[in-house]
Amino acid sequence: MILNDKTIRKYISEGLLEINPLDDIQIQPSSVDLRLGNEFLIYPEDIEIIDVRDPYFSNRLIKEIATEEGFIIKPKQFVLATTIEYIKLPDFLTAFVEGRSSLGRLGLFIENAGWVDAGFEGNITLEFYNANSIPIKIYPGMRICQLVFAKMEDRSEKPYRGKYQGQRGTTASRIFLDRD
């Protein structure tokens, strides 16, 4: 069941769902608008290969802090970013990260791993791809995506406690920690 605005507000007021900071204007009929943080991770153009087993690969990413003047995503560029909001989901809610259609219509694809497991806590790392042939300029603090909440039939027996639990800011891939 997708949560409506009334239930989202109720869960927040009861402390079951945490989203910080949050202004009531961000709560939509069936989602919550999340805003863009100012921290970006960029893949350098001189990287020849990404080795998923290399635990030091993320050290090669370039960290940029955007100002109110904005951040430019080049054509065909992939960039990691973060939300301002820190969220904490209970063990009976899951969430989907959805890009805003207004940005999609400009060619900016937001997230390609948009599932948030029950029990997750942290900032949401966003994956951006500029599919356009011209640069796109975005700004810290702007509404960048929507979080849609779904109530599960029952509480999760094993809520999320994975490698991204508690992440703050833009977080690079930690795939090298996978056991498979």
Swiss-Prot record:
This is dCTP deaminase, dUMP-forming. Pathway: Pyrimidine metabolism; dUMP biosynthesis; dUMP from dCTP: step 1/1. One of its GO terms (biological process) is dUMP biosynthetic process. Its EC number is 3.5.4.30. InterPro entries: dCTP_deaminase, dUTPase-like_sf, dUTPase_trimeric. The active site is at 127 (proton donor/acceptor). DCTP binds at residues 100-105, 117, 125-127, 146, 160, 167. Bifunctional enzyme that catalyzes both the deamination of dCTP to dUTP and the hydrolysis of dUTP to dUMP without releasing the toxic dUTP intermediate. It comes from the Bacteria. Pfam families: DCD. One of its GO terms (molecular function) is dCTP deaminase (dUMP-forming) activity. Keywords: Hydrolase, Nucleotide metabolism, Nucleotide-binding. Homotrimer. Signal peptide: none annotated. Belongs to the dCTP deaminase family. The gene is dcd. It is an enzyme of class 3 (hydrolase). The record marks 114-115 as: Important for bifunctional activity. It catalyses: dCTP + 2 H2O = dUMP + NH4(+) + diphosphate.
